[in-house]
């Protein structure tokens, strides 16, 4: 039973990483310039990504990942 739970959590972590990185790749592949695209990534001088108020796609993806990790047995 523990073996199945461990495999399930490994699958879940892999799936969440895949979802997170596919959202990043999708946004960075947009052809529009930063000024025209409300979904473009913006980076600060310290190398961290800056989320704007209208970056709801990223916020939803990151919130979903955090909620799943917090409620999973691995997060406790």
From Swiss-Prot:
Where can this protein be found? Secreted; Host nucleus; Host cytoplasm
What GO terms fall under cellular component here?
extracellular region; host cell cytoplasm; host cell nucleus
Sites where a glycan is attached: 54
Range of residues in the leader sequence: 1-24
Q: Which UniProt keywords apply?
A: Glycoprotein, Host cytoplasm, Host nucleus, Secreted, Signal, Virulence
Reproduce the free-text note on domains from the UniProt record: The RxLR-dEER motif acts to carry the protein into the host cell cytoplasm through binding to cell surface phosphatidylinositol-3-phosphate.
Functional summary from the UniProt entry: Secreted effector that dos not suppress the host cell death induced by cell death-inducing proteins.
| Family indicated by similarity | Belongs to the RxLR effector family.
What is the protein's given name?
Secreted RxLR effector protein 31
* Species classification: Eukaryota, Sar, Stramenopiles, Oomycota, Peronosporales
Task: Name the gene behind this protein.
Answer: RXLR31
């Amino acid at each position: 039973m523990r073996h199945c739970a461990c495999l399930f959590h490994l699958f879940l972590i892999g799936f969440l990483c895949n979802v997170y990185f596919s959202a990043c790749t999708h946004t960075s592949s947009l052809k529009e310039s930063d000024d025209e695209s409300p979904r473009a990534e913006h980076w600060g001088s310290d190398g961290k990504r800056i989320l704007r108020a209208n970056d709801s796609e990223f916020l939803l993806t990151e919130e979903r990942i955090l909620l799943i990790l917090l409620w999973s047995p691995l997060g406790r």
